[in-house]
């Protein structure tokens, strides 16, 4: 299944295309690579998932938030490129996590986005 078809099958609710909150491009193609700006975890109703891991949110809630941020990034990529099929693989994922000082499970949280990308492009390319 193509990346675009896979993405379409995963999105059960519309994720709104975000608008830049400053002077930056949501995505930019340079030398055969596409760079996508940071994304927030947008809920189906357009609200944000907010909270602090280790205080307000547990690992599963954080993982879901990372997946939602990943979905938002995919919507931006689709909007900018026309199709996710134009992307052959993910080279880098940078995730930022709001957490207490004692929280140590950051990789488990960011896996929410990593697993989404692996679903779209396959485990070797996602």
Pin down the residues of each PLM region.
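N-terminal presequence-like segments and the immediate start of the first folded domain
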Residues: 1-94, 99-126
